Amino acid sequence: MPHVDLNPLKQRMQAARAAAVAQFRQHPRPDMLLTELRRIVDQALRELVKLCPLPAGATLAAVGGYGRGELYPHSDVDLLILLPQPPSAADARAVEALVAALWDLGLEPGHSVRTLEDCEREARGDITVETALLESRWLAGSRTLMKRLDSAMQARLDAAVFFQAKRVEMQQRHARYQDTPYALEPNCKESPGGLRDLQVILWMARAAGFGHSWREVAQAGLLTSSEARDLRRAEQAFKRLRIELHLLTGRREDRVLFDLQPGLAAVYGIASTATRRASELLMQRYYWAARLVTQLNVILVQNIEERLFPRPDSDARLIDDDFRNLRERLDIVREDGFERNPTLLLRAFLVMQQHPELIGMSARTLRAIWHSRHRIDAQFRRNPVNRKLFLQILQQPRGIVHELRRMTMLNILPRYLPVFRRIVGQMQHDLFHVYTVDQHTLAVVRNLRRFTMPEHAQEYPLASQLIAGLDRHWLLYVAALFHDIAKGRGGDHSELGAREVRRFAQDHGLDPADAELVEFLVRHHLLMSAVAQKRDLSDPQVVRDFAAQVGDERRLAALYLLTVADIRGTSPRVWNAWKGKLLEDLFRLTLAALGGAHADAHTVLTERKDEAARLTRLAGLRDDAREAFWNQLDIAYFLRHDASEIAWHTRHLYYQVAPDEPVVRVRPTEHGEGLQVMVYTRDAPDLFVTTCGYFDAKSLSVQDARVHTTRHGWALDSFIVLAPEGFADLRAQATLVEHELAERLRDPHAARHAHAPRRLPHSHARRSRVFPVMPQAELSPDERSQSWRLSVTATDRPGLLYALARVFAEHGVDLIMAKIMTLGERVEDVFIVSGSALERPRSQMQFERAILDALAGDEPRQQAA
């Protein structure tokens, strides 16, 4: 085939597309741009087939979205080359030349070459192919063959079968996206509540003969005019978002990625406020639109199902005067029931809880609730009957989380609790929350509910035991609903939330003790986590101070339960068994303190040594051998380690008090997710740096570090480290660490050059780059000792602890203890340190600057001594 110069056609097409985009920038009307881009490509293709002819009798058809008449700036151009018979060699060459020309033209064709029989066979086996062919549109070639395809597709279309297949396909797609529209980086095309859901409804409606557009579907009685208007608005919003994503990235990109969210917000003219990022405001708009689509999708799919598979209403069984069971769905008896008696807007959810045979609500009921939600106003909220109903929903033995989720989706909970409305769809770009505030809140309620279920007792033994003994544990659900309700307002969200829940408690008639409990829980919902993860629990004063703040055992149990549920509802990556152990340790120590066991340091020391001695005797150690080793240890060591750790150290070190080689011993932790590492060697300035460098290179995440120097100058350091995710054989890992770390300590200088920090997963690195945490460092003297407390906050990154350890070594600062608190991609660490450099203002300032540089990822500044 002779060479065809496509440059003139390509240049005309590119100029026309650029003009269309420029027009869109002046007047951002999505449909106008999509139609114009489609028209430009239609015209280019018709010119192209004159230059590169189709095989004789063949048809060129647009399919899929392009066939529907929409073309996004960087979408594939979906084409069908329809042949009247299987291709000859000449036909194959003609098709090959045409496809090559499509690429040369700068289009990205998604093409298929089929006969009519091929199309029918493929459509029978794949609902996606059938849907694409149903939207086929003639571009060039044989119109007769195109009509035969249209006739064949319509003839084989079975509305009922098509509906069921599309519903299954939609359910599978939703499952791939975790069944939530609230993803951190949603796909505006494929995620639940996105463009694809809108297209599915129209495909179903079209197949059933209810129309091709929202107006026609409304005329068929499946939609009200206001619903059609809402869906049309949402569709336009998502179309524009998808267009902006393509234009912003210069590629086919349908995901609202972290990196793109600030740029998108700027395109939309959304500015940051004093309390919220522009990207958070953008995403809240997205989630509100996706929630609307999700809800109307449920109503419409049920409506179409009821039309396609009609069953007589005689199947219905009355539940009471207002509701009936219609095919295992809750159905309102009177269409105007909610308008006549708005109290039913809450009672509907209570009835759902009380009737486990119900699998959902009928489309009629969902629609009636949706359209009556405006009846929940100030007068409704003041009504004692409604207040009692709301508390009853929280007090039911089943269905609490399901109904709270349904109430949120139908906009009933945000209407009843206006303060809750502010947090619906509110994303927190803080590097550790992976849910919107409302979804996190409901996840906390779900976790609290799980504590009450026997099937989860093995997973949460202490929590299950405590909640079973907690009087009126439904108060925890109230605290959960309000614990983050003031997020995004500025100020202390715990304090603001406490005021909101106090008002709720007064309005809903909670007795004074219960009102005081929920207010305490909301005000102090972060307290237990902070103390457990940032303070030294071996210090009796820390426990006494915490016990004084908590006050009594009921508060302690409730705070423990809320804390565990809260952390576990933040992100799958934030919770680990080590945090669980710290919280449980703090709970038990505080319980003892509240019970009158106000032990001073001397009593704690005596009891701990007695228990450790008992454990060493059980291991066969003689008292004199043990005491020879213990004589090298001071009081601080015994106060900082529990009896089990002391006994473990003693068993391995009593016979080698001054060894020539480093001693490294490792064992799996009690909770089975990490390793406990003991390092015993002659003390050296770079010891902590070397050890941290090894852990970092092996992707072992340090959770806790305790550094001790014996009376005769040996370092006895203890670490809790977590193994990489998915590492199952902890005993094999323990053996490997014992060998490798001992080797590293024998020759630390050679190892320094071999250190290669671990890498964060790509998505985490992107998120932390776009939404970094401002590095903070606060150095303050410890009021009860000669040491200092260094608190740091920063974005997590490979080698961070190693970088800090190097700063300690370079400034002559000794580490006594480290408490590492990792919250997703954010770290909040506390170090107890000492050193003469901290006593002089100038060198202290240089140390703090170097710490900030390390937190920010910069090379330490060279300071004059």
From Swiss-Prot:
Region of interest: Uridylyltransferase: 1-318
GO terms under biological process: regulation of nitrogen utilization
Record-annotated ACT domain positions: 676-762, 789-865
InterPro entries found in the cross-reference section: ACT-like_dom_sf, ACT_dom, HD/PDEase_dom, HD_domain, NT_sf, PII_UdlTrfase/GS_AdlTrfase, Polymerase_NTP_transf_dom, UTase/UR
EC number: 2.7.7.59, 3.1.4.-
Catalytic activity as recorded in UniProt: [protein-PII]-L-tyrosine + UTP = [protein-PII]-uridylyl-L-tyrosine + diphosphate; [protein-PII]-uridylyl-L-tyrosine + H2O = [protein-PII]-L-tyrosine + UMP + H(+)
Domain named HD: residues: 437-559
Span list, region Uridylyl-removing: 319-675
Known cofactor(s): Mg(2+)
Renumbered residue ranges of the record's region Disordered: 747-767
Any one GO MF annotation of this record: [protein-PII] uridylyltransferase activity
Keywords annotated in UniProt: Hydrolase, Magnesium, Multifunctional enzyme, Nucleotidyltransferase, Repeat, Transferase
Feature: compositional bias, Basic residues: 751-767
Regulation: Uridylyltransferase (UTase) activity is inhibited by glutamine, while glutamine activates uridylyl-removing (UR) activity.
Known role: Modifies, by uridylylation and deuridylylation, the PII regulatory proteins (GlnB and homologs), in response to the nitrogen status of the cell that GlnD senses through the glutamine level. Under low glutamine levels, catalyzes the conversion of the PII proteins and UTP to PII-UMP and PPi, while under higher glutamine levels, GlnD hydrolyzes PII-UMP to PII and UMP (deuridylylation). Thus, controls uridylylation state and activity of the PII proteins, and plays an important role in the regulation of nitrogen assimilation and metabolism.
Similarity comment: family membership: Belongs to the GlnD family.
NCBIfam families: PRK03059.1, UTase_glnD
Domain comment, as recorded: Has four distinct domains: an N-terminal nucleotidyltransferase (NT) domain responsible for UTase activity, a central HD domain that encodes UR activity, and two C-terminal ACT domains that seem to have a role in glutamine sensing.
Name under which the protein is recorded: Bifunctional uridylyltransferase/uridylyl-removing enzyme
Species this chain originates from: Bordetella bronchiseptica (strain ATCC BAA-588 / NCTC 13252 / RB50)
Lineage: Bacteria, Pseudomonadati, Pseudomonadota, Betaproteobacteria, Burkholderiales
UniProt gene name: glnD
